Amino acid sequence: MDNKLIFHDSDTLICFLEIDEIEFLKKLFTNIIIPEAVLMELNVNNAPVNVRDNLNDLISDNFVEVREVEFASGEYIKNKCICEGYWTNGRPIGRGESAVLAFAIENEGIVASNNLSDVFEICEEYGIPILTASLMLAFAYELKIYTKSEINAIWCRILQETYQILPKQTFDEYYTELFEKDCNVLLKNYDFKKHYTVSKK
Protein backbone atom coordinates (compact mmCIF):
# COMPACT_ATOMS: atom_id res chain seq x y z
CA MET A 1 0.00 0.00 0.00
CA ASP A 2 1.29 3.44 -0.93
CA ASN A 3 0.72 5.85 1.93
CA LYS A 4 -1.37 8.90 1.17
CA LEU A 5 0.01 12.31 2.11
CA ILE A 6 -1.78 13.87 5.09
CA PHE A 7 -2.37 17.63 5.01
CA HIS A 8 -3.05 19.12 8.43
CA ASP A 9 -5.44 21.95 9.28
CA SER A 10 -4.82 24.20 12.28
CA ASP A 11 -7.54 22.86 14.58
CA THR A 12 -6.25 19.29 14.85
CA LEU A 13 -2.74 20.54 15.56
CA ILE A 14 -3.93 23.02 18.19
CA CYS A 15 -5.41 20.12 20.16
CA PHE A 16 -1.89 18.84 20.79
CA LEU A 17 0.29 21.96 20.47
CA GLU A 18 -1.68 23.89 23.08
CA ILE A 19 -1.30 21.17 25.72
CA ASP A 20 2.37 20.58 24.83
CA GLU A 21 1.74 17.05 23.53
CA ILE A 22 4.54 17.26 20.99
CA GLU A 23 5.60 13.68 21.63
CA PHE A 24 2.13 12.45 20.72
CA LEU A 25 2.51 13.94 17.23
CA LYS A 26 6.04 12.59 16.85
CA LYS A 27 5.02 9.09 17.91
CA LEU A 28 2.03 8.93 15.56
CA PHE A 29 3.51 10.63 12.47
CA THR A 30 6.90 10.63 10.77
CA ASN A 31 6.28 14.18 9.56
CA ILE A 32 3.47 16.71 9.30
CA ILE A 33 2.61 18.77 6.21
CA ILE A 34 0.83 22.11 6.56
CA PRO A 35 0.02 24.76 3.95
CA GLU A 36 1.49 28.22 4.46
CA ALA A 37 -2.04 29.49 5.24
CA VAL A 38 -2.21 27.15 8.25
CA LEU A 39 1.19 28.36 9.43
CA MET A 40 -0.11 31.93 9.30
CA GLU A 41 -3.25 30.96 11.27
CA LEU A 42 -1.17 29.33 13.99
CA ASN A 43 1.33 32.18 14.19
CA VAL A 44 -1.11 35.06 14.62
CA ASN A 45 -0.49 37.36 17.58
CA ASN A 46 -3.52 36.14 19.54
CA ALA A 47 -2.53 32.47 19.27
CA PRO A 48 -1.37 30.92 22.56
CA VAL A 49 2.38 31.39 22.97
CA ASN A 50 3.04 27.67 23.39
CA VAL A 51 1.16 26.91 20.16
CA ARG A 52 3.48 29.23 18.25
CA ASP A 53 6.60 28.10 20.09
CA ASN A 54 5.86 24.39 19.74
CA LEU A 55 5.01 24.75 16.06
CA ASN A 56 8.13 26.75 15.26
CA ASP A 57 10.28 24.24 17.16
CA LEU A 58 8.80 21.42 15.07
CA ILE A 59 9.49 23.38 11.89
CA SER A 60 13.09 23.99 13.00
CA ASP A 61 13.43 20.24 13.64
CA ASN A 62 12.14 19.56 10.07
CA PHE A 63 9.24 17.57 11.52
CA VAL A 64 6.68 20.03 10.17
CA GLU A 65 6.95 20.83 6.46
CA VAL A 66 5.31 24.05 5.22
CA ARG A 67 4.04 23.98 1.63
CA GLU A 68 3.20 27.06 -0.39
CA VAL A 69 0.34 27.13 -2.89
CA GLU A 70 2.23 28.01 -6.06
CA PHE A 71 0.68 30.49 -8.46
CA ALA A 72 -1.24 28.92 -11.38
CA SER A 73 -0.72 25.39 -10.00
CA GLY A 74 -3.52 22.87 -9.64
CA GLU A 75 -3.60 23.62 -5.92
CA TYR A 76 -3.79 27.36 -6.61
CA ILE A 77 -6.88 27.07 -8.80
CA LYS A 78 -8.66 24.69 -6.42
CA ASN A 79 -7.73 26.79 -3.40
CA LYS A 80 -9.15 29.94 -4.99
CA CYS A 81 -12.40 28.21 -5.96
CA ILE A 82 -12.88 26.73 -2.48
CA CYS A 83 -11.86 29.84 -0.57
CA GLU A 84 -14.24 32.06 -2.51
CA GLY A 85 -17.16 29.65 -2.21
CA TYR A 86 -17.48 28.57 -5.85
CA TRP A 87 -17.65 24.91 -4.79
CA THR A 88 -19.90 25.43 -1.77
CA ASN A 89 -22.88 27.36 -3.15
CA GLY A 90 -21.34 30.73 -2.40
CA ARG A 91 -20.26 29.90 1.17
CA PRO A 92 -16.60 30.92 1.57
CA ILE A 93 -14.24 28.56 3.39
CA GLY A 94 -11.34 29.66 5.62
CA ARG A 95 -7.92 30.05 4.03
CA GLY A 96 -6.37 27.23 6.03
CA GLU A 97 -9.14 24.75 5.27
CA SER A 98 -9.20 25.79 1.61
CA ALA A 99 -5.48 25.20 1.18
CA VAL A 100 -5.60 21.84 2.98
CA LEU A 101 -8.50 20.72 0.78
CA ALA A 102 -6.76 21.91 -2.39
CA PHE A 103 -3.55 20.00 -1.57
CA ALA A 104 -5.46 16.86 -0.59
CA ILE A 105 -7.56 16.86 -3.77
CA GLU A 106 -4.61 17.58 -6.06
CA ASN A 107 -2.44 14.90 -4.41
CA GLU A 108 -5.21 12.36 -3.63
CA GLY A 109 -4.28 12.75 0.01
CA ILE A 110 -5.97 12.98 3.40
CA VAL A 111 -7.39 16.03 5.18
CA ALA A 112 -6.54 16.19 8.89
CA SER A 113 -9.21 18.47 10.34
CA ASN A 114 -11.86 18.69 13.04
CA ASN A 115 -13.77 21.36 11.12
CA LEU A 116 -16.26 19.02 9.50
CA SER A 117 -18.73 21.81 8.72
CA ASP A 118 -16.17 23.24 6.28
CA VAL A 119 -14.42 20.17 4.89
CA PHE A 120 -16.91 17.28 4.91
CA GLU A 121 -18.97 18.24 1.83
CA ILE A 122 -15.97 18.71 -0.45
CA CYS A 123 -14.19 15.63 0.92
CA GLU A 124 -17.32 13.58 0.22
CA GLU A 125 -17.50 14.88 -3.34
CA TYR A 126 -13.87 14.01 -4.08
CA GLY A 127 -13.58 10.86 -1.97
CA ILE A 128 -10.99 12.42 0.34
CA PRO A 129 -10.52 10.71 3.74
CA ILE A 130 -10.74 12.89 6.86
CA LEU A 131 -8.54 12.28 9.91
CA THR A 132 -9.81 14.04 13.05
CA ALA A 133 -8.02 14.52 16.37
CA SER A 134 -10.43 11.95 17.82
CA LEU A 135 -9.36 9.38 15.24
CA MET A 136 -5.69 10.19 15.90
CA LEU A 137 -6.19 9.50 19.59
CA ALA A 138 -8.08 6.28 18.87
CA PHE A 139 -5.37 4.99 16.55
CA ALA A 140 -2.68 5.86 19.10
CA TYR A 141 -4.55 3.53 21.45
CA GLU A 142 -5.19 0.82 18.83
CA LEU A 143 -1.52 0.83 17.84
CA LYS A 144 -0.56 0.47 21.52
CA ILE A 145 1.44 3.70 21.45
CA TYR A 146 -0.56 4.88 24.47
CA THR A 147 -2.75 3.12 27.00
CA LYS A 148 -6.47 3.86 27.23
CA SER A 149 -5.96 5.75 30.49
CA GLU A 150 -3.25 7.90 28.88
CA ILE A 151 -5.52 8.69 25.92
CA ASN A 152 -8.39 9.52 28.28
CA ALA A 153 -6.08 11.94 30.10
CA ILE A 154 -5.05 13.67 26.85
CA TRP A 155 -8.71 13.81 25.76
CA CYS A 156 -9.66 15.44 29.05
CA ARG A 157 -6.85 18.02 28.78
CA ILE A 158 -7.91 18.99 25.25
CA LEU A 159 -11.45 19.67 26.48
CA GLN A 160 -10.33 21.52 29.60
CA GLU A 161 -7.31 23.47 28.36
CA THR A 162 -8.19 24.39 24.76
CA TYR A 163 -11.19 25.77 22.92
CA GLN A 164 -11.31 22.71 20.68
CA ILE A 165 -14.44 20.56 20.66
CA LEU A 166 -14.36 16.76 20.73
CA PRO A 167 -17.45 14.66 19.90
CA LYS A 168 -17.77 13.02 23.35
CA GLN A 169 -16.87 13.95 26.92
CA THR A 170 -14.54 10.97 27.33
CA PHE A 171 -12.39 8.88 25.04
CA ASP A 172 -14.10 5.73 26.32
CA GLU A 173 -17.46 7.02 25.05
CA TYR A 174 -16.00 8.01 21.68
CA TYR A 175 -14.17 4.72 21.20
CA THR A 176 -17.25 2.66 22.03
CA GLU A 177 -19.88 4.73 20.22
CA LEU A 178 -18.26 6.58 17.31
CA PHE A 179 -14.83 5.22 16.38
CA GLU A 180 -16.01 2.51 13.99
CA LYS A 181 -18.48 4.89 12.33
CA ASP A 182 -15.81 7.58 11.89
CA CYS A 183 -13.44 5.05 10.31
CA ASN A 184 -16.15 4.28 7.77
CA VAL A 185 -17.75 7.68 7.13
CA LEU A 186 -14.85 10.09 7.66
CA LEU A 187 -11.71 8.06 7.01
CA LYS A 188 -13.47 6.04 4.30
CA ASN A 189 -11.93 2.85 5.68
CA TYR A 190 -8.40 4.00 4.83
CA ASP A 191 -6.08 1.67 6.76
CA PHE A 192 -4.30 4.14 9.02
CA LYS A 193 -2.71 1.36 11.06
CA LYS A 194 -1.01 0.04 7.93
CA HIS A 195 -0.14 3.65 7.00
CA TYR A 196 1.57 4.00 10.39
CA THR A 197 3.47 0.72 9.99
CA VAL A 198 4.73 1.65 6.52
CA SER A 199 5.69 5.20 7.51
CA LYS A 200 7.64 4.06 10.59
CA LYS A 201 9.80 1.52 8.71
Segments from the language model and where they lie:
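Metabolite-binding pocket within alpha/beta catalytic cores that recognizes anionic/polar moieties
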Residues: H8-I14
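Anionic group-transfer/hydrolysis microenvironments
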Residues: D11, A37, L116
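Acidic catalytic patch
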Residues: F63-N89
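Feature 3881 marks metal-assisted phosphotransfer/nuclease machinery
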Residues: M1-L5, F16-N31, M40-N54, S60-D61, ...
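Short beta-strand scaffold positions
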Residues: H8, S113-N114
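Acidic, metal-associated active-site segment
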Residues: G94-G109
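Structural motif
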Residues: L5-I6, I110
